């Protein structure tokens, strides 16, 4: 075997090992916290807006010692709510999370995902996750047009998609610094 063949085979083998190990190491989940004021008069997600790549796992953590919360996708299959996630995406509902409990969901379909806390939607406890970027992801889906039957306070709490894409995350919850 000559030197050139040996180097070529070694390079191919090294590349295969590196590629395999890159896929074997999963990125840790990104966290969205559920919070509330000490007396419970205000509740929110932190961050309220988050930009992620397709295939990212989100971990919702209830950090509110005085309340149970949910992380629920807006979708007709869940309490007949309007669909505010991409059409090909699978809806999710964490069920009630007690303080300290967590729930994870992996988002693979590009587009805008709006979610809410079932007991606190009328308090404006909503969040928006943007998966991928428009024009860069096949199958990108903009936010669902129209408010459906969402409370005004919930609609007002969603951060704009462009702000999420520019900043990566938006931290504008009640009681949180902006």
Predicted stretch roles:
Residues 2, 7-178:
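Extracytoplasmic copper-binding redox domains, predominantly the cupredoxin/blue-copper superfamily
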